[in-house]
Amino acid sequence: MDLLQILQILFLIGRIIVGGYFLMAGFNHFKNVKMMAGYAASKGTPSAEAAIIGTGILLVLGGASFLLGYHPTIGTILLVIFLLGVSMKIHNFWTVADPQARMNEQAHFGKNIAMIGFLLMTLMINRPWPYSLGSVATRP
């Protein structure tokens, strides 16, 4: 096994971790719609239940895209849309008066912005990704 093959396998492992993270977050949205909608409503989100279902769809589709390497540009866009929206509306730490709650929201905001940076960097990775549905679809 050469270095390129090792790096391709490590990239696959990273895709499984990242894609799995977003998939689980999406499934969590569907599993806990009422609870999450209550929190979103407390943050002023209109139609909170529909917003939770919609963001769950973004997470599942984006996570699956990453995991499978199938149309990863579209998956990246979906995840960036989710992260931008939730960061500005839900984790808007600058509006929180309580210092402990503010720190918690700031941590989530920072994590989300870092994930956006990572996702944007993946747009430079050559396609099709190794060991992906995209690579299977392009084989002769």
Predicted segments with their positions:
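Extended, low-polarity transmembrane helix blocks
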Residues: M1-K31, S42, P46-L61, L67-P140
